[in-house]
């Protein structure tokens, strides 16, 4: 029995196999909707900042002069 997953966009059952051209999506339409959601930043991968943003304030740089050459 083939594995069946739900389309992440419309929840239509999708058979997971070589015949499923757009897996895990049911169609190109759902695939493009998902791509648009990523492009418009409706989805994001959570990451932990490498540095403490509050610590940057303690450096004492003036924003008006920081980016000037």
UniProtKB/Swiss-Prot annotation:
What's a GO biological-process term for it? regulation of DNA-templated transcription
Q: Which Pfam families match?
A: YacG
UniProt-annotated binding residues for Zn(2+): 7, 10, 26, 30
What InterPro entries does this protein's entry cite? DNA_gyrase_inhibitor_YacG, Znf_NHR/GATA
**Record-linked SUPFAM superfamilies:** Glucocorticoid receptor-like (DNA-binding domain)
Give the record's keywords alphabetically.
Answer: Metal-binding, Zinc
- Cofactors per UniProt? Zn(2+)
Q: Does Metal-binding appear among the keywords? A: yes
- Any note on cofactor binding? Binds 1 zinc ion.
Please indicate which superkingdom the organism of origin belongs to: Bacteria
Q: Which GO terms describe its molecular function?
A: DNA topoisomerase type II (double strand cut, ATP-hydrolyzing) inhibitor activity; zinc ion binding
Tell me, how does this one assemble? Answer: Interacts with GyrB.
Q: Function of this protein?
A: Inhibits all the catalytic activities of DNA gyrase by preventing its interaction with DNA. Acts by binding directly to the C-terminal domain of GyrB, which probably disrupts DNA binding by the gyrase.
Give the similarity note.
Belongs to the DNA gyrase inhibitor YacG family.
Its protein name is DNA gyrase inhibitor YacG
What does UniProt list as this organism's lineage? Bacteria, Pseudomonadati, Pseudomonadota, Gammaproteobacteria, Alteromonadales
